[in-house]
A protein has these predicted regions:
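A contiguous, well-structured pocket-lining segment that forms one wall/lid of small-molecule binding clefts
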Residues: 53
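Bacterial N-terminal signal peptides
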Residues: 1-7
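Primarily EF-hand calcium-binding motifs
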Residues: 57-59
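Terminal recognition/anchoring or ligand-binding modules at protein termini
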Residues: 9-44, 61-141
Length: 141
């Protein structure tokens, strides 16, 4: 799992340290981590750029950059950022609920996986690490 987190090391240490300290990750930080981690955003971009990228696509949450995201919302953003396909229910109704269920089913989200629960910065980074590891092994496509 640490391999996935190491691949995010190009980002500034200060930013990662700030995320790790967050008891509830914000939309802007979540969007930035996911898009930079997926290679869809340059690390020199801002959290506002990352949020705007999601807001112009299918995973728009309509939240402010400083608003916290739930596990379901984070899962939806992750599935969108990494192009992870979902099962029948997610395909029919892509929503935070079904995104969280899909990522729990695929062992990306480990432990409790309630769509409305808070996501700490540490857990957000663990989820990205897991996505990168499973993607590398071809188990998410």
């Amino acid at each position: 799992m640490m391999g996935g987190i190491v691949s995010l090391s190009a980002q500034s240490n200060e930013f990662i340290d700030g995320v790790l300290e967050q008891p509830r990750i914000t939309y802007g930080n979540a969007a930035y981590l996911l898009l930079v981690g997926s290679g869809d955003l340059d690390e020199s971009a801002t959290v506002n750029d990352a949020r705007d990228r999601f807001e112009s696509g299918a995973a728009a949450l309509g939240s402010g950059v400083d608003e916290p995201v739930t596990l379901g919302e984070y899962s939806l953003l992750a599935m969108n950022a990494f192009g992870i396909t979902g099962g029948v229910m997610y395909t029919m109704a892509p929503s935070p609920r079904y995104a969280a269920r899909e990522l729990a089913f695929r062992d990306v989200v480990q432990g409790r996986a309630y769509p409305r629960m808070d996501v700490s910065g540490e857990r957000a980074l663990r989820i990205i690490g897991r996505v990168l590891d499973l993607n590398e092994g071809g188990r998410l496509q």
